[in-house]
Amino acid sequence: MTYLHNMKTEWVRKHINDLVSEGLKQMSNPALDDNMFKIWLDYSKQVLEISTKHYNAAILLNYLRPIMSIDSQLPPTQKVGICLDYLIGVLRII
């Protein structure tokens, strides 16, 4: 692997790690509601779009699949958990 590829990988890892940390904070917030979840979800999509577009755009596309099928009746903590499962899975393979 090239130095540039390694730098891109580290860049993506850092931002996904930050998303996971923010998501865990949201899950531990007893006031978490659907509006807060939607704000975090939009934020996570924007971060993934910016950080992965020159590395592997499929990361964002694959993220959109499970989040589009999240049952709206689930509690916000479960919704964040579904997103975190995907993000943690990405961290394991990059």
State the predicted function of each range.
Residues T2-I94:
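Charged interaction/catalytic cores of defense and host-pathogen modules
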